[in-house]
Amino acid sequence: MSKKFEQIYNKSITKPEEFWREISEDIFWFKKPTKILNKSNPPFYKWFEDGTTNTCYNALDFHIDNGLGEKTALIYDSPITSNKAKFTYNELKSKVSKFAGALKNQGLQKGDRA
């Protein structure tokens, strides 16, 4: 194990709130969290409970907004079927939007878990 990896890992174990606060700086937040970890109801811990983010935005829109829309976002390479495909951020966002629309048509609403 590399020395750097070991240092990062140890910090994540010994100082989890400090570690994840630093990591959270690399994520786009609509509302930045002030509470990193709530341990009041173990083992049901709550992370970033007062923050608001969106995984899809961080995975796709953020990169498109920063000029990477035509760059490859996903490479599909199936060892079973030998099918291969590449998707740009723009293409992937279009497919995700269509799927989100299908879920909405099935009654899924904001805040639901799918």
Predicted regions and their residues:
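Active-site diphosphate/adenylate-binding microenvironment
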Residues: K32-N54
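A short N-terminal helical cap/helix-turn-helix that marks the beginning
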Residues: I13-K31, G51-I75
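Short amphipathic alpha-helical segments
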Residues: F5, E70-T72, I80
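Short, contiguous pre-domain boundary segments
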Residues: M1-Q7
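A non-catalytic, amphipathic alpha-helix used as a structural packing/dimerization or gating element
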Residues: Q7, K11-E18, E91-K98
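Conserved AMP-binding/adenylate-forming core of the ANL superfamily
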Residues: C56, L74-R113
